[in-house]
Amino acid sequence: LAIGLGITTRDDLWMSRFGRGQAANRAQFRAELAEMVTALEHFPCIAAWVPFNEGWGQFESRQVAEWLKRRDPTRLVDAASGWFDRGAGDFQSRHIYAIKLRRGRPDQRAFALTEFGGYSLKIPGHVWDENQRFGYKFFETAEALTEAYVKLLDEQLIPLISQGLTVAIYTQTTDVEIEINGYLTYDRQIEKMEAAVLRAAHERVYAAFAAAILAQTGRGGAG
């Protein structure tokens, strides 16, 4: 589907939060990482490999990232998505929720906001569990959610683009079990925000990225 739509993706290897200190577990991780790359490397939609996410099972980040770059020099590596950055890989990768969006100390790597937002709205009758919910900021109406979302993009995300932001990944496309922070409900039946409003807001984001590319390279991006 991603190939057909012309969408690039990031592929991450699921890692247990426990057992990172055991040699056998590390060896198993490395073996499964190698198997994953071999199985998926022929898909051109994959733009980056992500060995570790939010510190889960993370170990020897630099060595793992360097191995990935040798194994597949055609793709980027996000060595530690979100937390516990060890200066490895191609991205300074951050997850930011509930506080103002900002970048860390600049270095030679690309600045990537690999998770942000998580704005949540429950639509009764369209959730996985009526009695549980998870999100980072909750709203009671679609209008309030939309207003806050557009403000987040216009006042916080877009200014970061001129500061070197290269990636912005919003949480998230759909509700996932008790997580109610999707653009769509869990059953994919309800759009929580009007598509026309989202399109207009997203076009401003795309335009800001295109302007940043033009300023840095002298060449505009495809809008």
Located regions from the model:
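Substrate-binding/catalytic cleft of secreted carbohydrate-active enzymes
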Residues: 1-200, 210, 217
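Surface beta-strand/loop "capping" patches
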Residues: 204-223
